[in-house]
Protein backbone atom coordinates (compact mmCIF):
# COMPACT_ATOMS: atom_id res chain seq x y z
CA UNK A 1 0.00 0.00 0.00
CA UNK A 2 2.89 2.45 0.52
CA UNK A 3 3.67 2.48 -3.20
CA UNK A 4 -0.02 2.81 -3.98
CA UNK A 5 -0.27 5.82 -1.66
CA UNK A 6 2.76 7.35 -3.36
CA UNK A 7 1.09 7.15 -6.79
CA UNK A 8 -2.49 7.82 -5.67
CA UNK A 9 -2.66 11.33 -7.15
CA UNK A 10 -1.17 10.15 -10.45
CA UNK A 11 -3.77 7.35 -10.67
CA UNK A 12 -6.54 9.87 -9.95
CA UNK A 13 -5.19 12.09 -12.74
CA UNK A 14 -4.89 9.23 -15.26
CA UNK A 15 -8.41 8.00 -14.50
CA UNK A 16 -9.88 11.52 -14.68
CA UNK A 17 -8.31 12.04 -18.11
CA UNK A 18 -10.15 8.97 -19.42
CA UNK A 19 -13.37 9.77 -17.57
CA UNK A 20 -13.58 13.34 -18.89
CA UNK A 21 -13.29 12.19 -22.51
CA UNK A 22 -15.79 9.33 -22.20
CA UNK A 23 -19.02 9.61 -24.18
CA UNK A 24 -20.98 7.97 -21.38
CA UNK A 25 -20.06 8.86 -17.81
CA UNK A 26 -21.34 6.46 -15.17
CA UNK A 27 -19.67 7.44 -11.93
CA UNK A 28 -16.75 9.70 -11.10
CA UNK A 29 -14.77 8.06 -8.34
CA UNK A 30 -13.52 10.37 -5.59
CA UNK A 31 -9.85 11.27 -5.30
CA UNK A 32 -7.95 8.60 -3.38
CA UNK A 33 -10.48 5.90 -4.30
CA UNK A 34 -7.92 3.43 -5.67
CA UNK A 35 -5.62 3.67 -2.65
CA UNK A 36 -8.57 3.33 -0.26
CA UNK A 37 -9.96 0.28 -2.05
CA UNK A 38 -6.57 -1.46 -1.90
CA UNK A 39 -6.54 -0.92 1.87
CA UNK A 40 -10.21 -1.77 2.44
CA UNK A 41 -10.20 -4.97 0.35
CA UNK A 42 -6.58 -6.16 0.36
CA UNK A 43 -7.39 -9.72 -0.73
CA UNK A 44 -10.17 -8.87 -3.18
CA UNK A 45 -8.82 -5.80 -4.97
CA UNK A 46 -5.73 -5.50 -7.15
CA UNK A 47 -4.07 -2.63 -8.97
CA UNK A 48 -1.62 -3.16 -11.83
CA UNK A 49 0.52 -0.30 -13.01
CA UNK A 50 2.22 0.32 -16.35
CA UNK A 51 5.48 2.22 -16.38
CA UNK A 52 7.59 3.93 -19.03
CA UNK A 53 10.99 5.34 -18.13
CA UNK A 54 10.10 5.37 -14.43
CA UNK A 55 6.77 7.16 -14.89
CA UNK A 56 3.34 5.65 -14.23
CA UNK A 57 1.56 5.83 -17.60
CA UNK A 58 -1.42 3.60 -16.89
CA UNK A 59 -3.15 1.30 -14.45
CA UNK A 60 -6.09 -1.05 -14.15
CA UNK A 61 -8.01 -2.19 -11.07
CA UNK A 62 -9.57 -5.61 -10.56
CA UNK A 63 -12.16 -6.63 -8.00
CA UNK A 64 -12.44 -10.34 -7.18
CA UNK A 65 -15.91 -11.58 -6.25
CA UNK A 66 -15.89 -15.35 -5.66
CA UNK A 67 -15.37 -16.86 -9.15
CA UNK A 68 -15.70 -13.55 -11.02
CA UNK A 69 -12.96 -11.02 -11.69
CA UNK A 70 -14.32 -7.58 -12.55
CA UNK A 71 -12.10 -5.10 -14.36
CA UNK A 72 -13.38 -1.95 -12.74
CA UNK A 73 -11.46 1.20 -13.53
CA UNK A 74 -8.42 2.17 -15.49
CA UNK A 75 -6.37 5.18 -16.31
CA UNK A 76 -4.04 5.93 -19.20
CA UNK A 77 -1.73 8.70 -20.23
CA UNK A 78 -3.45 10.00 -23.39
CA UNK A 79 -0.21 10.86 -25.18
CA UNK A 80 1.34 7.46 -24.55
CA UNK A 81 -1.91 5.72 -25.49
CA UNK A 82 -1.69 7.25 -28.96
CA UNK A 83 1.81 5.83 -29.53
CA UNK A 84 1.79 2.49 -27.67
CA UNK A 85 -0.87 -0.26 -27.58
CA UNK A 86 -1.19 0.08 -23.81
CA UNK A 87 -4.95 -0.55 -23.73
CA UNK A 88 -4.42 -3.93 -25.43
CA UNK A 89 -1.73 -4.79 -22.86
CA UNK A 90 -4.18 -3.88 -20.15
CA UNK A 91 -6.82 -6.26 -21.57
CA UNK A 92 -4.34 -9.12 -21.99
CA UNK A 93 -2.93 -8.60 -18.50
CA UNK A 94 -6.47 -8.89 -17.15
CA UNK A 95 -6.71 -12.35 -18.69
CA UNK A 96 -3.36 -13.27 -17.10
CA UNK A 97 -4.54 -11.98 -13.71
CA UNK A 98 -7.69 -14.09 -13.96
CA UNK A 99 -5.67 -17.19 -14.86
CA UNK A 100 -3.21 -16.60 -12.02
CA UNK A 101 -5.91 -16.41 -9.37
CA UNK A 102 -7.30 -19.74 -8.20
CA UNK A 103 -11.05 -20.18 -8.71
CA UNK A 104 -11.69 -17.43 -11.25
CA UNK A 105 -14.05 -18.68 -13.95
CA UNK A 106 -15.27 -15.41 -15.46
CA UNK A 107 -13.61 -12.10 -16.32
CA UNK A 108 -15.96 -9.14 -16.73
CA UNK A 109 -14.55 -6.28 -18.77
CA UNK A 110 -17.61 -4.02 -18.76
CA UNK A 111 -19.48 -2.56 -21.74
CA UNK A 112 -17.16 0.09 -23.15
CA UNK A 113 -14.70 -0.39 -26.04
CA UNK A 114 -16.47 -3.63 -27.00
CA UNK A 115 -14.69 -4.03 -30.34
CA UNK A 116 -11.23 -3.87 -28.75
CA UNK A 117 -12.30 -6.29 -26.04
CA UNK A 118 -13.62 -8.74 -28.62
CA UNK A 119 -10.10 -8.76 -30.14
CA UNK A 120 -8.89 -10.62 -27.03
CA UNK A 121 -11.83 -13.03 -27.01
CA UNK A 122 -14.38 -11.14 -24.91
CA UNK A 123 -18.02 -11.80 -25.70
CA UNK A 124 -20.90 -9.45 -24.89
CA UNK A 125 -23.56 -10.62 -22.46
CA UNK A 126 -26.81 -8.95 -21.48
CA UNK A 127 -26.74 -6.76 -18.41
CA UNK A 128 -29.71 -6.23 -16.16
CA UNK A 129 -30.28 -3.30 -13.84
CA UNK A 130 -33.00 -1.98 -11.61
CA UNK A 131 -33.59 1.71 -12.26
CA UNK A 132 -35.98 3.45 -9.93
CA UNK A 133 -36.53 7.08 -9.06
CA UNK A 134 -37.81 8.11 -5.63
CA UNK A 135 -40.51 10.27 -7.17
CA UNK A 136 -43.34 8.04 -8.58
CA UNK A 137 -44.13 10.46 -11.42
CA UNK A 138 -40.48 10.67 -12.49
CA UNK A 139 -40.26 6.91 -12.13
CA UNK A 140 -42.75 6.56 -15.01
CA UNK A 141 -40.47 8.72 -17.15
CA UNK A 142 -37.54 6.49 -16.24
CA UNK A 143 -39.42 3.54 -17.78
CA UNK A 144 -39.83 5.43 -21.06
CA UNK A 145 -36.19 6.54 -21.05
CA UNK A 146 -34.84 3.04 -20.37
CA UNK A 147 -36.76 1.69 -23.39
CA UNK A 148 -34.52 3.84 -25.63
CA UNK A 149 -31.27 2.42 -24.26
CA UNK A 150 -29.56 -0.14 -26.47
CA UNK A 151 -25.97 -1.41 -26.55
CA UNK A 152 -23.68 0.08 -29.18
CA UNK A 153 -23.40 -2.21 -32.19
CA UNK A 154 -19.88 -3.23 -33.19
CA UNK A 155 -18.07 -5.67 -35.43
CA UNK A 156 -17.39 -8.66 -33.22
CA UNK A 157 -14.08 -10.38 -33.79
CA UNK A 158 -13.77 -14.14 -33.49
CA UNK A 159 -10.26 -14.82 -32.27
CA UNK A 160 -10.84 -18.47 -31.36
CA UNK A 161 -11.77 -21.21 -33.79
CA UNK A 162 -15.32 -22.47 -33.37
Task: Annotate each PLM feature.
Residues 1-82:
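A conserved beta-strand-loop-helix scaffold within acyl/acetyltransferase catalytic domains
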Residues 20-30, 94, 156-162:
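Short, charge-rich amphipathic segments
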Residues 16, 20-23, 39-42, 55, ...:
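Hydrophobic alpha-helix feature that most strongly marks membrane-spanning transmembrane helices
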Residues 52, 105-162:
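Active-site/acyl-donor-binding loops of N-acyltransferases
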Residues 5-6, 88-89, 145:
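Short, flexible segments with low predicted structural confidence
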